[in-house]
């Protein structure tokens, strides 16, 4: 897949997920893909970075922009609502050589974001959305750094925006667009509507801007099926990789026509869990690593017959030594997980999208929403 001047051996992208796709997880995914297939071939995108917090050099935000030496190309996603901060943040990325690819987030459906006019609420305001994309592209002028854009089908079924969002992004110079095939109202519930990806692909015909599909990819076969059904040029995977960092090796192999690596045994997963914790400790210290790995162990052990007491003990680890001792008890297990490629992560149910008062009155309004920048929490 080609995005601007970036060419990858696999059309697979790791979707940014807060609290998950930090440097340790990205490095782990790359290591496993390299080990199983001989290449680290896709794009691994960092956690969403708030443009304003970056411009203000918030300490936590700047730490989140850290990339490992092995990460090439370095891929960063920005959350922004204001063309001014967008331009300044992207210029900062360019001038300080922070990343090689910039993705713009217009897909977040979280109520605390949309009720202020951010995230998946933005594409409804066509001019504002276009101004933001234009600012990002302008800030990369004279470089090889491509700007890509991610959005949803729309706010709800009465307010679809993805076709306009794709065309506007192309007109403003975006190098690719990605569609999460759900509305903001759906959040993560129900099934992704791949037919809308196909509609966007058709709508973008003639622009030379590739379309990346996102939604309900939990197994290697899913990615191949999405690309065949929709004609999309690449796939983006989020929740499917929770506790399954080897999924990228499987996806890449499937799409290249190679033998797909099998699901790992419980013993192999134990070694992956420890490596993940080790990378977390190197990045953020052992105390933080032992707290952070707890949520991951629930995902890693899904479908394995390990029992509630073992899971409870893992959730209480306070040192890498303690974690290693627990994992040693399952290190020789050849058990395989049941239903390993079932849906995982957030699902919930659809709900009305929280929006600022009068937000839907004028889709051409380009006023920057007040207070829509997420607080400086690194989000």
Question: What function would you assign to each model-found segment?
Answer:
Residues 11-21, 73-86, 122-123, 149-162:
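Active-site mouth loops of central-metabolism enzymes
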Residues 12-15, 44-46, 74-78, 100-102, ...:
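Hydrophobic faces of well-ordered beta-strands that scaffold small-molecule active sites
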Residues 17-19, 49-51, 79-81, 107-109, ...:
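Active-site beta-loop-alpha junctions enriched in small/polar residues
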Residues 2, 17-96:
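Glycine-rich, positively charged N-terminal anion/phosphate-binding segment
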Residues 57-61, 125, 179, 244, ...:
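Short, solvent-exposed helix-helix connector turns and helix-capping sites enriched
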Residues 1-8, 12-13, 18, 24, ...:
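Alpha/beta catalytic cores of nucleotide-metabolism and tRNA/nucleoside-modifying enzymes
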Residues 35-39, 87-118, 122, 126-210:
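Alpha/beta enzyme core
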